[in-house]
Each structure stands twice: as structure tokens, then as C-alpha cells.
């Protein structure tokens, strides 16, 4: 059963990342609408999860730990940071401006086909634009830059702290053995 789910998730993700045909264009459009220039990340996660389900043949339980929290903070800081601009939107214009940006990225006379060369103007998608506008309207753009930097640093620390500590411990053990 999980093998079938894994295969379906893998195939849908591959179709989306290839951006061919109506279904591929639609999946890419939805992902770009939500995540902007990071539209490929959900597809890469889908491919990885699909492989995992196919190969392991057992259910995957998401463990909420500090590493996952760090990855989420890094993702949020990337989405917000890529949506910041020199002239922040207000709540009344954020959705209209984003809709204009994504409409400009759509190929003429098509519904969902995006020009991937024009996707850079989308920033972090509607998620990033909303969060950036929320932060800019409450703590100004300078405060938002500070929040993005802090989110990134905390996320990196939470993600890699255990790994760095293990490397330091192993190097200390190696030095002790070398001295003996």
C-alpha cells in the first residue's frame, strides 16, 4: 500500500518538476503561486518522500524535533527574505500586486504555463509576500530584515548544532588517541 502511495507521490512530483503538459504546468503554477522562486522544493521533497515510501515499505512518521524546526525556520526566512522589496506592499495591495506579478509570468494565450525565466519576480510566492507584508506593516522593513536574519541564524543553529558538536567530540577523541 505504501509502495503505491510512494510511486504516485514520486510520479506527481516528477510531472510537476518537468513542467510539461497541462498537468505539469498546473502543478508548477500552483507551486510557484504558493512558494515563488522556491517552486521546486515541494517537488524535490515529494520525490524524496516517494523514494522513501517505495524503498522502505513502511509508514513514515514525521518526528517533530529541533532539526525539523530549524529547517522550517530556514524555509520561512528564505520565503520572507525573497519577498522583501524596496517598496513593501500594504495589506490592501499585497494580493493585487502578487496577482499582477504571476500574471506577467504566464505565457500569453495559456492558462497555467509559466515562463520560468520570469519567475524571479515572484519572490517567495503568496506565502512569502503575505508574511513579508505582515512583518513590514508591524515592525517596518528594517525590523523585517532583522527578523529574517535571526530566523536564518536560529534555523541554521538548530539544524546543525548536533552535527557540529559530534564533529568536535570526535576530533577531541582523535587527539586524545593520537597523544597516547
List the predicted regions and their residue ranges:
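Alpha-helical transmembrane segments used as membrane anchors
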Residues: 1-179
Amino acid at each position: 500500500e505504501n509502495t503505491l502511495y510512494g510511486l504516485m507521490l514520486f510520479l506527481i512530483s516528477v510531472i510537476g518538476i518537468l513542467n510539461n503538459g497541462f498537468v505539469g504546468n498546473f502543478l508548477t503554477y500552483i507551486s510557484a503561486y504558493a512558494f515563488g522562486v522556491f517552486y521546486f522544493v515541494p517537488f524535490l521533497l515529494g520525490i524524496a518522500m516517494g523514494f522513501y515510501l517505495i524503498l522502505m515499505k513502511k509508514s513514515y512518521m514525521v518526528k517533530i524535533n529541533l532539526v525539523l524546526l530549524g529547517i522550517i525556520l530556514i524555509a520561512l526566512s528564505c520565503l520572507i527574505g525573497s519577498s522583501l522589496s524596496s517598496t513593501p506592499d500594504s495589506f490592501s495591495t499585497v494580493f493585487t500586486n502578487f496577482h499582477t506579478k504571476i500574471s506577467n509570468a504566464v505565457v500569453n494565450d495559456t492558462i497555467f504555463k509559466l515562463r520560468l525565466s520570469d519567475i524571479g519576480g515572484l519572490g517567495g510566492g503568496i506565502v512569502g509576500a503575505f508574511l513579508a507584508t505582515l512583518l513590514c506593516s508591524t515592525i517596518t522593513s528594517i525590523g523585517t530584515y532583522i527578523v529574517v536574519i535571526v530566523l536564518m541564524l536560529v534555523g541554521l543553529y538548530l539544524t546543525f548544532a548536533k552535527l557540529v558538536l559530534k564533529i568536535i567530540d570526535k576530533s577531541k577523541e582523535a587527539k586524545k588517541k593520537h597523544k597516547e
